[in-house]
Amino acid sequence: DYGQKNPTVFEAFGVDYSRQALRGLDEWYHCGRDEGQKSPSEYAKELKDFCDRLEKEYDRVVSWVFIDPSAAGLIEEVRRIMPHIEVIPAFNDVKLGISRVQKFFSFRRILINRNQKQLIRELGLYQYDPESIKKGKEEVLKVNDHAADATRYLVCGMWGLIAVFLPVSDRE
């Protein structure tokens, strides 16, 4: 998930075919409001360094990066400095994405690593706006949601490959 004043978060997951699950690997987090803003090219360099470290640590190649579709400048910078990785603008249907992530948690098909501290923190805070619920709508509160959004982008982006980890009736 990308932000200038709001946090920029990279959530890394691997596909564990033997357990039919997404396995959390690590996280990178920077809040522009607290730590100073960075340019898209600086974030692209941070992402490259993060992916290089993951590849070395896990002896696996990073294949895909899903980036907030509103971050066109970052997408272009990442494509420029990481041409070997498929950079995909994230699917951003919030309601469907939340439903898919919930299914993965319900069926224990997503495993979080203790290094994913912001994701762990945010999952306990992620909520719908009580006022919107009173009006018969479910609108997500857009606070404390950056790591969770990054995870939602991943689940939706990989859905065609990972939906098979769920019971047939829950694959939609």
Predicted regions and their residues:
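Short, intrinsically disordered, charge-balanced linker/junction segments flanking boundaries
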Residues: D1, S169-R171
